[in-house]
């Protein structure tokens, strides 16, 4: 019974991400020295961003191999800079390190931010954990807070400075038919095994 409930939850989250009419707000490249490490894109349903606006989606496309556990540490360090509770960040780090896979070039990690929760999608797999509103706000602030260490990326991420980069690179193409909004059950990729896709 628990497995059935979990599977229904994952399908609901997957449906939310697919049925939202995502429009690009902006995107930016994160570099370290001469290396292009990843690109990050911001999407909303209005092609613009305002404070406390939901839903939002952040898409990270990796250009270099990155271990999932190390990327989780990077995110938590940014959150700790916001002076959040250590109890919160410790729990968040543990959970992200449990669910994040290792990332290869061209992999996508999406974070869908809803008003009271958020969740990650790695390529076409919903990662099995719902984060609360506090985590969701902290994740948004990593990229958009005035105190963020990524503040130099914000003009492009918010669409205030244009880039020649194509937003289509943030589109992952799963091996399934397009989502039919009239169908409450999206078609999953061939050979989809819910047991293997319940990460964490």
Label the model's feature ranges.
Residues 20-200:
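Terminal leader/tail segments of proteins
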Residues 14-17:
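N-terminal signal peptide c-region/cleavage motif recognized by signal peptidases
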Residues 2-10:
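Sec-dependent signal peptide recognition
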Residues 1-3, 20-21:
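Absolute protein N-terminus
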């Amino acid at each position: 019974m628990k497995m059935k409930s979990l599977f229904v939850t994952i399908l609901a989250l997957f449906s939310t991400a697919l049925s939202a009419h995502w429009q690009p707000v902006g995107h930016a490249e994160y570099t370290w020295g001469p290396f292009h490490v990843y690109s990050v894109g911001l999407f909303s349903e209005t092609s613009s961003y305002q404070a406390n606006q939901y839903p939002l989606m952040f898409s990270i496309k990796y250009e270099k191999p990155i271990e999932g556990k190390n990327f989780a540490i990077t995110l938590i360090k940014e959150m700790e800079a916001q002076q959040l509770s250590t109890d919160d960040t410790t729990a968040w780090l543990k959970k992200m390190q449990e669910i994040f896979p290792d990332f290869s070039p061209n992999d996508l990690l999406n974070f869908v931010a809803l008003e009271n929760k958020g969740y990650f999608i790695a390529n076409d797999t919903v990662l099995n954990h719902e984060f609360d509103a506090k985590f969701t706000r902290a994740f948004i602030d990593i990229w958009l807070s005035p105190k963020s260490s990524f503040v130099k990326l914000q003009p492009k991420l918010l669409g205030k400075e244009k880039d020649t980069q194509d937003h289509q690179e943030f589109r992952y193409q799963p091996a399934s038919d397009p989502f039919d909004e009239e169908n409450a059950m999206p078609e999953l990729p061939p050979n989809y095994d819910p047991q293997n896709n319940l990460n964490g």
